[in-house]
Every structure is written in C-alpha cells, then in structure tokens.
Amino acid sequence: GLDFIKSKEFLKEDYEKVLEVLSSFQNPPRILSEGSKIEIFKEVGPPKEFVDQFKFHDFEGTHGIGHTRMATESAVTTMGAHPFSTGSDQCLVHNGSLSNHNSVRRKLIQDGVQFETNNDSEVAACYLTQKMSSGLTLRSALTESLDDLDGFFTFVVATSKGFGVLRDRIACKPAVLAETKEYVAFGSEYRA
C-alpha cells in the first residue's frame, strides 16, 4: 500500500529526518517533489484514469503540466514517468532522447547528485537543478543546456513562478504553442 505524508511544513523543517525514516523501510516510498508550490503526481496508465484517480478537475493553480510518454531510454514504471522533480518547486517533462546522458550523469554523480532512475529525462532535470542551484535563472540554465546536452529534445520546465520551453538546436521534436486570453498551451507533438 501507499502512505503519503502531506505536511509541507514537516517536510521542509525535518527533511533529513524524513529521508532517514523512509530509508529504513524494506520497500521505501519515494519523495516525488519538495517545496510548497508544486505538487507532482505520477502513474502509469491511460491519462483519463489518471485524471480521475487524482481528481485533477478539482485543482486550482496558475499552471499545470501533463505528459503521455513513449519510453525510449528507460522502463515504463511509475518512477520513470514524467514529470521529474529534482529541485524545490521545479519539474521537467521531456520529449526526445539525450545521446550524452550517461556522461552527463557521471559528471553529476561526481558532483554529489543522486539519481532514482536510469531515465535520460531525470539527467536533464538534475542538470537544470544544479545550474539553478548555482544561481542561474531558468532561462540561463536552459540556454547553457544547449551547449552541454546532446541529442534531440524538447523540454518544458515548470517552476513556482512560471514555465519555460526549450528545443534543441536542430529542432527535431515539435514545439507547438497556442495562446488565448484564458491560457497558454503547449504540445510536443502536432496532434496534441
């Protein structure tokens, strides 16, 4: 079964203690996100069931990101599902494939980053988290990623203040944006 701790104040004040307690379980639960503005929900299955299961139609907020995935770099599991959150109040979804994710992963591990999956999208999320933790803005971190990440990709990265979209320089994966008075919508496939 799943047990959830839904006290943001507890998680913020006693984060290390929570991690220690969680690691003592035989099958430890995972923290999917931290922070006070963004909540992450992951599941494998049909999107309609996922929306109904978590009652997304009852949510309020300034922005939301959903992702339907065709796995190319890792297994189809709940932990491998998008979005990936590797920093406080930020998350990433990704369409494409990073060809240098293993070398970037090794460098991040040398810098002390810990990974939960073998997913190339998690590597991108950790890369951006590290860049923003060093003081870069989301825009600057995304711009630097064009020099450091190889492959074909489109990223959508959300923070508590908004979101950014980035395509690789070759632009193999679509980035379709629609803007009305009520919303801005994005898709990384034309039929979306």
Question: Which positions does each model-derived feature cover?
Answer:
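Conserved short alpha-helical segments that host acidic/polar catalytic motifs at enzyme active sites
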Residues: 1-192
